[in-house]
Amino acid sequence: MDPTKFLDQFLGGDSKAKLQQAGGAAKQQFDRMGGMGGFAGGAAAGGLAGLLLGNKKVRKMAGGVVGYGGAAALGALAFKAYQNWQEGKQAASAPAATEADMPRTEARFLPDAAPAATGEPFQLSLIRAMIGAAKADGHVDAAEQKLLFEQVERMGLDAEAKGFVFDTLAKPTDLSEIAGAARTQEQAAELYLVSRLAIDPDHPAEKAYLEALAHRLSLPAELVAHLDRQAETGLSA
């Protein structure tokens, strides 16, 4: 299993670029599907994340992390948040990451920079974190899990990758396991960020989940605010 390829497949890869290359008809179809709720809207953006998160969250990701290359985009957002925080900028007015920032991302912020504290590829830790966050509101019911399993079968993943997704979906979310994957503050920031991308902060259960995760990751409140800012505004062009 190639962990970076798996993470990109999970996020939907460069679906935005593919839609632009396909022309107006494909984009119109995407827009129509995006107007539908739940899994239908999520499927329009491609990737398991699209199905898992549903329409309310995936539309943002389709223009950002999904649209600009998945794993590399996560690193760019985390690095921009970290950079703004270190420079003492106010989170509310801090500049958002753009496509031009991606080549300037420091290597330590890329998901493949180092293994997780547990020894597993850190890309798998990020996928586990996103699945856990998406389940925080309890919306992944048995019928939706069945659709996810069917989508996994269609994606051409190898047996190891399939098993990872199936096991993570089936078992209860363990915040200690998710937070325990962080070897460095950079990894902690990425685990929080990928979870924040899957969270609706207006939903009480999801907000509580995110606050608990930030606490477990020992992230400074100011850095958390910058990560929230990038999750909302980064790579949104």
Language-model-detected regions and their locations in the chain:
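Primarily EF-hand calcium-binding motifs
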Residues: I131-A133
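Small-residue-enriched hydrophobic alpha-helices in membranes
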Residues: D2-R128, E144-A237
